[in-house]
Regions:
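C-terminal, well-structured catalytic/ligand-binding subdomain of enzymes
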Residues: 1-81, 114-349
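Gly/Pro-rich turn-and-neighbor structural signature
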Residues: 89-120
Length: 349
């Protein structure tokens, strides 16, 4: 199993970024040197940093206006790694740079339930062989402490905070992707700032997002899904929710850009969750079995361009806990990180 670093990030924004960057400097420099953060392996055309600088700058300007603390943290990341500022920003924008690239097998299956004790769980399906780039960030933010799953220098991906808010995500394809706040930074801002499900939803509705996504939010009593398409948002709420990679809102579904093969995969995975039912929050074995069994598990076929399951998580907003299987969850050893452990001892197991 690949070692998963646990990084404690505290202090002012730039200091948090520097700590993150220094801790992973060798790994992130190697990643950036691998065909420009592996984008050269994934894109349909050659890529180089100089050609991407105007797009990176346009996104950075929006982020700096909307989320200045996180913009400063990205700049700190660059200093900590010892790389070009634009390279650190590229790490936050890889998905946006790829744009509407092929999505053929999966790109996360996510579900949440508040029927009993609250739980949010999901697979992380990515291309680029990113299971060697996983880290867990223990962040002391401006308002809340949080545990954040990160890949390849991302400031955010999914996680849980000490206000009892868990958030996950799914890729959906639609609308015009344009300079804005990348959804991963939006998730980090939610974890830093949100006191409640309502506030998390409000944040996601107000931010100028760069690309389409579906966000799953689970509090101690409510589960809500926010679908984002351009400047529009659709809110779904139920005691049990599941989402894959096609829009569920009927109006958004008419503008879905997912290809037919990916949509078939997305539907199969969604039906698999619905047919199995969401296990009780404390039934770790049943969650693990669901997350590590096809079609929800997307196996590796050896093609770096194809999405595969590179991690699976169970988030417990009531416990402030992430249970993580890094890599293929059917073979990976699980590990638990909790805010309570961090508060008590300053470390995790």
């Amino acid at each position: 199993m690949n070692s998963v670093p646990l990084l404690e990030l505290s202090g002012p924004p730039r200091a948090r970024g520097i700590t993150h960057g220094r801790a992973l400097a060798g790994r992130l420099r190697g990643f950036l040197d691998d065909s420009l953060a592996r984008l050269g392996h994934l894109a349909d055309r050659p890529v180089d940093l100089d050609s991407l600088r105007p797009s990176i700058a346009a996104h950075r300007d929006v982020v700096a206006a909307a989320l200045p603390d996180l913009a400063e943290e990205v700049d700190g990341l660059a200093a900590g790694v010892g790389v070009d500022r634009d390279a650190a920003w590229l790490l936050q924008l890889r998905r946006e740079v790829l744009g509407y690239s092929r999505v053929t097998a999966g790109d996360c299956t996510t579900y949440a339930s508040v029927r009993g004790r609250p739980v949010l769980a999901q697979t992380v399906d990515l291309n680029g062989n990113l299971d060697d780039q996983i880290a867990v960030l223990a962040v002391s933010g401006p308002r809340h402490r949080s545990l954040v799953l990160s890949f390849a220098g991302l400031l955010g991906y999914l996680g849980v905070n000490d206000a009892g808010i868990a958030i996950g995500l799914n890729l959906v394809l639609g609308g015009e992707w344009e300079p804005g706040v990348p959804p991963y930074l939006a998730i980090r801002h939610v974890l830093d700032s949100a006191d409640s499900v309502d506030q998390a939803v409000e944040i996601l509705c107000e931010l100028p997002l760069a690309s389409s996504r579906s966000f799953m939010i689970c509090g101690e009593e409510r589960a809500v899904c926010v679908e984002s398409l351009g400047s529009q948002r659709s809110i779904l709420e139920d005691a049990d929710l599941a989402h894959t990679n096609h829009f569920l809102d009927p109006d958004f579904a008419e503008r879905d850009e997912i290809n037919v093969f990916a949509k078939n995969s997305s539907r199969r995975r969604l039906e698999a969750v619905r047919e199995a039912g969401i296990p009780d929050a404390s039934d770790t074995a049943s969650h693990h079995r669901l997350l590590s069994t096809p079609p929800i598990l997307v196996p590796d076929n050896g093609d770096i361009r194809r999405e595969r399951t590179v991690a699976a998580v169970i988030l417990r907003p009531d416990l402030g806990e992430i249970r993580l299987w890094p890599g293929d969850p059917s073979t990976a050893e699980g590990q638990v990180h909790s805010l309570q452990q961090w508060s008590a001892s300053g470390s995790h197991r």
